[in-house]
Amino acid sequence: MSAKRAELKKTHLSKNYKAVCLELKPEPTKTFDYKAVKQEGRFTKAGVTQDLKNELREVREELKEKMEEIKQIKDLMDKDFDKLHEFVEIMKEMQKDMDEKMDILINTQKNYKLPLRRAPKEQQELRLMGKTHREPQLRPKKMDGASGVNGAPCALHKKTMAPQKTKQGSLDPLHHCGTCCEKCLLCALKNNYNRGNIPSEASGLYKGGEEPVTTQPSVGHAVPAPKSQTEGR
Protein backbone atom coordinates (compact mmCIF):
# COMPACT_ATOMS: atom_id res chain seq x y z
CA MET A 1 0.00 0.00 0.00
CA SER A 2 2.81 2.42 0.82
CA ALA A 3 4.42 1.88 -2.52
CA LYS A 4 1.19 2.59 -4.28
CA ARG A 5 0.64 5.75 -2.26
CA ALA A 6 4.12 6.99 -3.05
CA GLU A 7 3.55 6.42 -6.70
CA LEU A 8 0.19 8.13 -6.53
CA LYS A 9 1.71 11.16 -4.79
CA LYS A 10 4.32 11.48 -7.44
CA THR A 11 1.99 11.05 -10.36
CA HIS A 12 -1.12 12.71 -9.07
CA LEU A 13 0.04 15.76 -7.17
CA SER A 14 -2.34 17.90 -9.05
CA LYS A 15 -5.39 15.78 -8.47
CA ASN A 16 -8.08 16.46 -5.94
CA TYR A 17 -7.93 14.99 -2.50
CA LYS A 18 -11.31 13.37 -2.91
CA ALA A 19 -10.29 11.65 -6.05
CA VAL A 20 -7.19 10.38 -4.36
CA CYS A 21 -9.21 9.12 -1.40
CA LEU A 22 -11.58 7.37 -3.68
CA GLU A 23 -8.73 5.69 -5.44
CA LEU A 24 -7.15 4.68 -2.18
CA LYS A 25 -10.42 3.21 -0.87
CA PRO A 26 -9.80 -0.39 0.29
CA GLU A 27 -11.16 -3.20 -1.83
CA PRO A 28 -14.26 -4.83 -0.42
CA THR A 29 -13.60 -8.24 1.14
CA LYS A 30 -15.65 -11.22 0.10
CA THR A 31 -17.63 -12.80 2.88
CA PHE A 32 -19.10 -16.29 2.69
CA ASP A 33 -21.93 -17.63 4.73
CA TYR A 34 -20.98 -20.63 6.81
CA LYS A 35 -24.34 -22.26 6.27
CA ALA A 36 -23.97 -22.03 2.52
CA VAL A 37 -20.50 -23.53 2.69
CA LYS A 38 -21.83 -26.26 4.94
CA GLN A 39 -24.61 -27.02 2.49
CA GLU A 40 -22.13 -27.18 -0.39
CA GLY A 41 -20.06 -29.66 1.62
CA ARG A 42 -23.17 -31.67 2.22
CA PHE A 43 -23.84 -31.79 -1.48
CA THR A 44 -20.32 -33.00 -2.20
CA LYS A 45 -20.57 -35.66 0.50
CA ALA A 46 -23.96 -36.77 -0.77
CA GLY A 47 -22.56 -37.20 -4.27
CA VAL A 48 -19.67 -39.30 -3.00
CA THR A 49 -21.96 -41.52 -0.93
CA GLN A 50 -24.30 -41.92 -3.88
CA ASP A 51 -21.42 -43.12 -6.01
CA LEU A 52 -20.39 -45.50 -3.28
CA LYS A 53 -23.93 -46.77 -2.99
CA ASN A 54 -24.09 -47.34 -6.72
CA GLU A 55 -20.83 -49.24 -6.61
CA LEU A 56 -22.10 -51.30 -3.72
CA ARG A 57 -25.27 -52.12 -5.63
CA GLU A 58 -23.22 -53.25 -8.60
CA VAL A 59 -21.07 -55.38 -6.34
CA ARG A 60 -24.17 -56.86 -4.73
CA GLU A 61 -25.63 -57.68 -8.11
CA GLU A 62 -22.40 -59.34 -9.16
CA LEU A 63 -22.35 -61.29 -5.92
CA LYS A 64 -25.93 -62.39 -6.47
CA GLU A 65 -25.07 -63.56 -9.97
CA LYS A 66 -22.06 -65.42 -8.64
CA MET A 67 -24.19 -66.99 -5.91
CA GLU A 68 -26.73 -68.11 -8.49
CA GLU A 69 -23.95 -69.65 -10.57
CA ILE A 70 -22.61 -71.37 -7.46
CA LYS A 71 -26.10 -72.70 -6.68
CA GLN A 72 -26.45 -74.06 -10.20
CA ILE A 73 -23.05 -75.72 -9.94
CA LYS A 74 -24.03 -77.14 -6.57
CA ASP A 75 -27.27 -78.53 -8.00
CA LEU A 76 -25.32 -80.16 -10.81
CA MET A 77 -22.86 -81.58 -8.32
CA ASP A 78 -25.71 -82.91 -6.18
CA LYS A 79 -27.25 -84.57 -9.22
CA ASP A 80 -23.91 -86.06 -10.18
CA PHE A 81 -23.42 -87.23 -6.61
CA ASP A 82 -26.86 -88.86 -6.63
CA LYS A 83 -25.97 -90.60 -9.88
CA LEU A 84 -22.69 -91.73 -8.41
CA HIS A 85 -24.48 -93.03 -5.33
CA GLU A 86 -26.91 -94.99 -7.49
CA PHE A 87 -24.03 -96.34 -9.54
CA VAL A 88 -22.24 -97.39 -6.36
CA GLU A 89 -25.37 -99.19 -5.14
CA ILE A 90 -25.71 -100.95 -8.49
CA MET A 91 -22.08 -102.01 -8.28
CA LYS A 92 -22.65 -103.35 -4.76
CA GLU A 93 -25.64 -105.38 -5.93
CA MET A 94 -23.62 -106.74 -8.85
CA GLN A 95 -20.83 -107.66 -6.45
CA LYS A 96 -23.32 -109.51 -4.24
CA ASP A 97 -24.68 -111.39 -7.24
CA MET A 98 -21.16 -112.30 -8.33
CA ASP A 99 -20.33 -113.51 -4.82
CA GLU A 100 -23.45 -115.67 -4.74
CA LYS A 101 -22.65 -117.12 -8.16
CA MET A 102 -19.08 -117.82 -7.10
CA ASP A 103 -20.35 -119.61 -3.98
CA ILE A 104 -22.68 -121.70 -6.12
CA LEU A 105 -19.85 -122.57 -8.51
CA ILE A 106 -17.56 -123.52 -5.63
CA ASN A 107 -20.27 -125.74 -4.13
CA THR A 108 -20.93 -127.40 -7.48
CA GLN A 109 -17.21 -128.02 -7.97
CA LYS A 110 -16.98 -129.54 -4.49
CA ASN A 111 -20.01 -131.74 -5.17
CA TYR A 112 -18.50 -132.73 -8.52
CA LYS A 113 -15.12 -133.59 -7.00
CA LEU A 114 -16.59 -135.77 -4.21
CA PRO A 115 -18.04 -138.40 -6.61
CA LEU A 116 -14.72 -138.50 -8.43
CA ARG A 117 -12.95 -139.31 -5.17
CA ARG A 118 -15.53 -141.96 -4.33
CA ALA A 119 -15.30 -143.44 -7.81
CA PRO A 120 -12.86 -146.25 -6.84
CA LYS A 121 -15.17 -147.40 -4.03
CA GLU A 122 -18.14 -147.32 -6.37
CA GLN A 123 -16.12 -149.22 -8.95
CA GLN A 124 -15.24 -151.85 -6.34
CA GLU A 125 -18.90 -152.15 -5.39
CA LEU A 126 -19.86 -152.44 -9.03
CA ARG A 127 -17.19 -155.10 -9.53
CA LEU A 128 -18.50 -157.03 -6.54
CA MET A 129 -22.02 -156.73 -7.88
CA GLY A 130 -20.78 -157.86 -11.29
CA LYS A 131 -19.07 -160.85 -9.71
CA THR A 132 -22.25 -161.82 -7.89
CA HIS A 133 -24.21 -161.50 -11.12
CA ARG A 134 -21.61 -163.40 -13.10
CA GLU A 135 -21.40 -166.34 -10.68
CA PRO A 136 -24.48 -168.12 -12.06
CA GLN A 137 -23.32 -167.34 -15.60
CA LEU A 138 -20.90 -169.47 -17.53
CA ARG A 139 -17.14 -168.79 -17.58
CA PRO A 140 -15.01 -170.57 -20.21
CA LYS A 141 -12.05 -172.54 -18.81
CA LYS A 142 -9.65 -174.95 -20.45
CA MET A 143 -10.01 -178.59 -19.57
CA ASP A 144 -7.06 -180.82 -18.79
CA GLY A 145 -6.18 -182.81 -21.88
CA ALA A 146 -8.44 -180.76 -24.20
CA SER A 147 -7.70 -177.74 -26.33
CA GLY A 148 -8.83 -176.02 -29.50
CA VAL A 149 -12.47 -176.06 -30.38
CA ASN A 150 -13.58 -178.60 -27.77
CA GLY A 151 -11.92 -176.80 -24.82
CA ALA A 152 -14.45 -174.01 -24.42
CA PRO A 153 -17.56 -176.24 -24.54
CA CYS A 154 -16.04 -178.54 -21.92
CA ALA A 155 -15.39 -175.64 -19.58
CA LEU A 156 -18.94 -174.41 -20.12
CA HIS A 157 -20.20 -177.89 -19.39
CA LYS A 158 -18.28 -178.03 -16.11
CA LYS A 159 -19.73 -174.71 -15.01
CA THR A 160 -23.25 -175.77 -15.83
CA MET A 161 -22.87 -179.13 -14.13
CA ALA A 162 -21.35 -177.82 -10.85
CA PRO A 163 -24.49 -176.09 -9.46
CA GLN A 164 -26.66 -179.02 -10.52
CA LYS A 165 -24.52 -181.37 -8.41
CA THR A 166 -24.92 -179.24 -5.31
CA LYS A 167 -28.65 -178.79 -5.76
CA GLN A 168 -29.79 -182.19 -6.96
CA GLY A 169 -27.11 -184.34 -5.32
CA SER A 170 -27.09 -186.85 -8.21
CA LEU A 171 -26.93 -186.51 -11.99
CA ASP A 172 -29.54 -187.76 -14.36
CA PRO A 173 -28.36 -190.31 -16.89
CA LEU A 174 -29.38 -187.94 -19.64
CA HIS A 175 -28.16 -184.37 -19.33
CA HIS A 176 -30.79 -181.75 -20.21
CA CYS A 177 -29.13 -178.46 -21.19
CA GLY A 178 -30.85 -175.16 -20.91
CA THR A 179 -30.92 -172.24 -23.29
CA CYS A 180 -27.36 -171.33 -22.34
CA CYS A 181 -25.91 -174.50 -23.86
CA GLU A 182 -28.33 -175.54 -26.56
CA LYS A 183 -25.40 -175.97 -28.89
CA CYS A 184 -23.00 -177.39 -26.32
CA LEU A 185 -20.92 -179.99 -28.11
CA LEU A 186 -19.95 -181.89 -25.00
CA CYS A 187 -23.57 -182.17 -23.88
CA ALA A 188 -24.50 -183.56 -27.27
CA LEU A 189 -21.61 -186.03 -27.10
CA LYS A 190 -22.55 -187.15 -23.60
CA ASN A 191 -26.20 -187.55 -24.45
CA ASN A 192 -25.33 -189.58 -27.51
CA TYR A 193 -22.91 -191.66 -25.46
CA ASN A 194 -25.52 -192.40 -22.81
CA ARG A 195 -28.00 -193.34 -25.49
CA GLY A 196 -25.45 -195.62 -27.18
CA ASN A 197 -24.77 -193.38 -30.16
CA ILE A 198 -21.11 -192.43 -30.55
CA PRO A 199 -20.52 -189.56 -33.00
CA SER A 200 -17.74 -189.51 -35.50
CA GLU A 201 -14.94 -186.94 -35.66
CA ALA A 202 -16.87 -184.97 -38.27
CA SER A 203 -19.70 -184.40 -35.83
CA GLY A 204 -17.37 -182.64 -33.31
CA LEU A 205 -17.52 -179.41 -35.27
CA TYR A 206 -20.66 -177.59 -36.19
CA LYS A 207 -21.24 -174.50 -38.24
CA GLY A 208 -23.64 -171.65 -37.55
CA GLY A 209 -26.91 -172.67 -35.94
CA GLU A 210 -26.89 -176.35 -37.17
CA GLU A 211 -27.08 -179.13 -34.58
CA PRO A 212 -24.29 -181.70 -34.42
CA VAL A 213 -24.85 -184.84 -36.48
CA THR A 214 -24.46 -188.17 -34.71
CA THR A 215 -23.61 -191.50 -36.35
CA GLN A 216 -23.45 -195.05 -35.06
CA PRO A 217 -19.95 -196.10 -33.98
CA SER A 218 -18.22 -198.93 -35.80
CA VAL A 219 -16.07 -200.17 -32.93
CA GLY A 220 -16.54 -199.73 -29.16
CA HIS A 221 -18.10 -196.95 -27.13
CA ALA A 222 -15.19 -194.52 -26.93
CA VAL A 223 -15.11 -190.84 -27.70
CA PRO A 224 -12.50 -190.09 -30.35
CA ALA A 225 -9.77 -187.59 -29.54
CA PRO A 226 -9.71 -184.31 -31.47
CA LYS A 227 -7.35 -183.79 -34.37
CA SER A 228 -5.22 -181.28 -32.50
CA GLN A 229 -4.33 -183.86 -29.83
CA THR A 230 -3.52 -186.55 -32.36
CA GLU A 231 -1.33 -184.21 -34.34
CA GLY A 232 0.51 -183.10 -31.16
CA ARG A 233 1.23 -186.71 -30.28
UniProtKB/Swiss-Prot annotation:
The keyword Coiled coil applies. Keywords: Coiled coil. Testis-specific. Pfam families: Tsc35. InterPro entries: Tex35. GO terms for cellular component: microtubule cytoskeleton; nucleus. Residues 45-111 form a coiled coil. Residues 199-233 are annotated as: Disordered. This is Testis-expressed protein 35. The lineage of its organism: Eukaryota, Metazoa, Chordata, Craniata, Vertebrata.
